[in-house]
Amino acid sequence: MSEEKQQEVLKFFSTVREEYENRIGFKMRTQSRLRVQVEARVAIINAIRPYGTLMNIAKVMDKKDHSTIVHSLKSHETHFAFSPNYRAKYKIALETVRDTAVANGVDPH
């Protein structure tokens, strides 16, 4: 991926994160283990996955490397199956990504 394309992806991800935080009503703290924070992070990570690499997502989520992102992707099904709050956050995350992508003319492929 070219440097220019990478910068576009990171800008898009940052815009999505800001809009998502506005919609859910709080800032995501990257070090917090509170369930509400974890579910919010996992939801947005899974929603933006089709739009970039694991490293791009890690950068925008203030993580050191992609391993946390891989863990979040793997935990999606469990959260989705057992947490109504997570399902609501994931729906908001998907809508945020879709709306932001349409507004900015971004295609996931």
Residue ranges and their predicted role:
Residues 65-69:
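Helix-turn-helix DNA-binding helix
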Residues 37-52:
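Short, amphipathic alpha-helical "recognition" segments used to contact nucleic acids or chromatin
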Residues 80-103:
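Short Lys/Arg-enriched helix C-cap and helix-to-coil transition segments
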Residues 1-15, 96-99, 106-109:
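General nucleic-acid-binding
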Residues 5, 34-38:
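Residue-level marker of regulatory loop/turn positions in helix-turn-helix DNA-binding domains and
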Residues 19-34:
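Short, Lys/Arg-enriched N-terminal segment that forms or immediately precedes the first helix
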Residues 49, 72-73, 80:
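DNA major-groove recognition helix of helix-turn-helix
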Residues 56-61:
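Short alpha-helical "recognition helix" segments of helix-turn-helix
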